């Protein structure tokens, strides 16, 4: 059966992504000096104005204005005359108590194990996914879209393409046949540029200097539609054209249109929030299942209740590609191999470190520098299942 899947990516200067980076840079500052910091901050930015709001409980007071300026400058923006404001208070004491002491501990349910001592920071369902489309075990459209924006950003920073700015986007549609990527259907690239930039030259430069290398995994054919700045002139961009807000690029952050999303954003949240930490764990589990060759595709869903340590749902879907056992058998093995309480997730993935600014652009998954991308549970899975 033939199907089409699409994914998009944005560059570091896209307004929403700048806000994500500011939020995660603030989080990193807190974690650098106090690994137990509780952070949930949102950022809104528009012409000449940046607002930070949320809850921060930490033994360290981050230099928010300094962080904002640093991120803006690193993303290619001038900070002269910028207005900044903060509306930050401490985490709700009710939430803090529920997270610090789990319901299992409060109700004396079962053994009072340290792994079950802390509760989830919120309710929700988090989804992780892996497939054998690519060496990263990620969907092909997602990998290609991020490669395009990475190359575009590198060309801007190095001056390899001149007179372009940091606001840009890419979108890739891939044709699948019987669940496998077979051809590149379309590519869309939009890149902000200077007023004097020749658009035909820009089109040629992006095709030659960006797409040629970015699309090596699945090169275009003669029928692939390639659209460069299809709106025409793209001079007014960045915060002059759009208002940025944290948490508005959820599908860019994850897997594209192929995989559902539980709805919880990542950036600006410490990993006591299962919105973030459980999404990383779900990816870790799914990737190890595919790496173990138990399935060609695997989607792992974890659901939590606020203040409760153990997940209220663990579900696995291999979409009929399972090779060893039924999906419910895989789901039953997960708690035996992976720790899925908040304490276990934080410790096994080392999520109290200041590593989050780098996650906030070019996707949270499929990047070997992150601990949830390890495939070190393959043997343990095989022992538990075979």
Tell me what each language-model feature is.
Residues 1-40, 45:
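N-terminal, positively charged regions that mediate nucleic acid binding
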Residues 6, 48, 66, 73, ...:
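Glycine-rich, mobile lid/loop segments that gate access to catalytic sites or pores
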Residues 8-10, 14-19, 118-134, 235-259, ...:
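Conserved phosphate/anionic-ligand binding catalytic regions in large, soluble enzymes, centered on
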Residues 12-31, 133-150, 269-293:
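Alpha-helical support elements that line or immediately flank enzyme active sites
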Residues 37-41, 168-174, 224-228, 294-305:
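A short glycine-rich, hydrophobically flanked beta-strand micro-motif that places a catalytic Asp/Glu
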Residues 43, 124-131, 170-193, 241-259, ...:
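Short beta-strand elements
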Residues 46, 295-297, 305-386:
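Internal helix-turn-beta structural module
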Residues 197-289, 293:
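Glycine-rich anion/phosphate-binding loop at the beta-strand->alpha-helix junction
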